[in-house]
């Protein structure tokens, strides 16, 4: 069963919600279900939940005036609570911004230009990946809540575990797709047609490349055919792109590996030879290492259910290399957006406060009991 939890301080919207849910109760199937609950919420104004205690979405409602005030007094940083909730429950986050549509950008709302409010809303979407829904008034907000609630109750919400390991085929498709012009569809065909080692060794004749077709029986694009033929002839730039598609091997590392030799040279050598390659970094020189070397040999020789081997030194299916975590990569990637020191401190403070209360549900979501109060105090301060 799905249900909506509304914060008891949402006095202006709750009457409309009660009316809207009353109409929903006319449905015989939902007649005896308590779809709307009014409680005190500590994060957000509304929670869309699934029985027994799974949080699917958290919604914060603000008028333009409230939004402007939050920018001035610092309550805008309260979004960290919502971000922490999403981290713990994998729920979706929404901001309802209430007010007339498209006012003049220079119009002052609570002494804040509307253009500044739009900028803050854009940052919420781009930086924090929070959905923004604009509404006209309280009644319209209630309607949008009902639409959102109905969509969640009818759609299967599937949360993919972040630790899900991709299959060999998926990784090999990604490898082929590192080449410009090769889509996931063509990448899958290549992954199950030949190995990279097969191509760079010239064992896939150009006439065979010319006969490759898509699932719709159309020939490969001419650009892709020329690129595959150039790889078979030892084009170093394309070899670097292919090698960079191997897990934990980026473009810089691939270029360093192929600095003095072609890709085929390493595929014809024992794995130990590749593992001993010296990689020059800014302050030191390191070896490529056995794990990366095994990954290179494994994925460049992978072909469908049966890999095409170049020599007896290649590793077997049973010894598939364990992918190194992101922290072990040679070239680390900086986050797209850096969180401010103040926001980080707020998030850390919230995380430490919530750590002792954290209880995981069997599905991997957090229970909602920590985000609502069992008893509502009549003296609770208004938002």
Swiss-Prot record:
<feature type="domain" description="ERCC4">
    <location>
        <begin position="3"/>
        <end position="101"/>
    </location>
</feature>
<dbReference type="GO" id="GO:0048257">
    <property type="term" value="F:3'-flap endonuclease activity"/>
</dbReference>
<dbReference type="GO" id="GO:0048476">
    <property type="term" value="C:Holliday junction resolvase complex"/>
</dbReference>
<feature type="compositionally biased region" description="Polar residues">
    <location>
        <begin position="357"/>
        <end position="367"/>
    </location>
</feature>
<keyword id="KW-1114">Inhibition of host interferon signaling pathway by virus</keyword>
<dbReference type="GO" id="GO:0039502">
    <property type="term" value="P:symbiont-mediated suppression of host type I interferon-mediated signaling pathway"/>
</dbReference>
<dbReference type="GO" id="GO:0000727">
    <property type="term" value="P:double-strand break repair via break-induced replication"/>
</dbReference>
<feature type="region of interest" description="Disordered">
    <location>
        <begin position="336"/>
        <end position="367"/>
    </location>
</feature>
<dbReference type="Pfam" id="PF02732">
    <property type="entry name" value="ERCC4"/>
</dbReference>
<comment type="similarity">
    <text>Belongs to the asfivirus EP364R family.</text>
</comment>
<dbReference type="InterPro" id="IPR033309">
    <property type="entry name" value="Mus81"/>
</dbReference>
<keyword id="KW-1090">Inhibition of host innate immune response by virus</keyword>
<dbReference type="InterPro" id="IPR006166">
    <property type="entry name" value="ERCC4_domain"/>
</dbReference>
<dbReference type="GO" id="GO:0003677">
    <property type="term" value="F:DNA binding"/>
</dbReference>
<dbReference type="GO" id="GO:0006308">
    <property type="term" value="P:DNA catabolic process"/>
</dbReference>
<keyword id="KW-0922">Interferon antiviral system evasion</keyword>
<dbReference type="GO" id="GO:0052170">
    <property type="term" value="P:symbiont-mediated suppression of host innate immune response"/>
</dbReference>
<comment type="function">
    <text>Plays a role in the inhibition of type I interferon signaling pathway. Mechanistically, specifically interacts with 2',3'-cGAMP and cleaves it via its phosphodiesterase activity. In turn, prevents 2',3'-cGAMP interaction with host ER-resident STING1 leading to inhibition of downstream signaling pathway and type I interferon production.</text>
</comment>
<feature type="compositionally biased region" description="Basic and acidic residues">
    <location>
        <begin position="347"/>
        <end position="356"/>
    </location>
</feature>
<keyword id="KW-0899">Viral immunoevasion</keyword>
<dbReference type="InterPro" id="IPR011335">
    <property type="entry name" value="Restrct_endonuc-II-like"/>
</dbReference>
<keyword id="KW-0378">Hydrolase</keyword>
<keyword id="KW-0945">Host-virus interaction</keyword>
<dbReference type="GO" id="GO:0008821">
    <property type="term" value="F:crossover junction DNA endonuclease activity"/>
</dbReference>
<keyword id="KW-0426">Late protein</keyword>
<protein>
    <recommendedName>
        <fullName>ERCC4 domain-containing protein EP364R</fullName>
        <ecNumber>3.1.4.-</ecNumber>
    </recommendedName>
</protein>
């Amino acid at each position: 069963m799905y249900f909506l939890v509304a914060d008891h301080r949402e006095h202006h919207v709750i009457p409309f919600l009660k009316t809207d849910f009353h109409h929903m109760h006319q449905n015989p199937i939902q007649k005896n279900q308590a779809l709307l609950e009014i409680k005190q919420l500590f994060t957000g104004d509304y929670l869309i939940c699934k029985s027994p205690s799974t949080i699917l979405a958290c919604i914060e409602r603000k008028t333009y005036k409230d939004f402007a005030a939050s920018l001035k007094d610092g309550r805008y940083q309260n979004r960290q609570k919502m971000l922490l909730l999403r981290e713990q429950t994998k729920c979706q986050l929404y901001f309802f911004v209430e007010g007339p549509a498209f006012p003049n950008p220079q119009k002052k709302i609570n002494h804040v230009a509307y253009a500044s409010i739009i900028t803050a809303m854009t940052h919420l979407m781009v930086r924090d990946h929070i959905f923004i829904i604009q509404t006209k008034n309280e009644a319209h907000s209630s309607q949008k809540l009902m639409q959102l609630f109905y969509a969640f109750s009818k759609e299967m919400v599937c949360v993919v575990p972040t630790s899900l390991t991709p299959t060999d085929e998926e990784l090999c498709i990604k490898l082929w797709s590192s080449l410009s012009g090769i889509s996931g569809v063509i990448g899958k065909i290549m992954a199950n047609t030949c190995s990279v080692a097969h191509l760079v060794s010239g064992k896939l004749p150009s006439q065979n490349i010319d006969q490759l077709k898509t699932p719709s029986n159309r020939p490969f694009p001419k650009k892709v055919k020329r690129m595959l033929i150039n790889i078979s002839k030892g084009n170093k730039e394309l070899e670097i792109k292919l090698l960079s598609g191997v897990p934990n091997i980026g473009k810089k590392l691939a270029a360093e590996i192929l600095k003095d030799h072609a890709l085929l040279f390493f595929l014809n050598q024992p794995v130990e030879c590749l593992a001993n390659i010296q990689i020059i970094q800014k302050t030191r020189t390191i070896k490529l290492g056995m794990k990366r070397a095994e990954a290179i040999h494994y994925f460049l020789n992978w072909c469908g259910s049966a890999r095409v081997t170049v020599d007896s030194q290649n590793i077997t299916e049973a010894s598939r290399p364990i992918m190194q975590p992101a922290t072990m990569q040679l070239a680390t990637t900086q986050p797209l957006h850096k969180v401010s020191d103040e926001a980080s401190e707020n998030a850390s403070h919230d995380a430490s406060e919530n750590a002792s209360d954290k209880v995981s549900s069997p599905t991997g979501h957090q229970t909602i009991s920590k985000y609502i109060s069992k008893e509502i105090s009549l003296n609770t301060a208004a938002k």
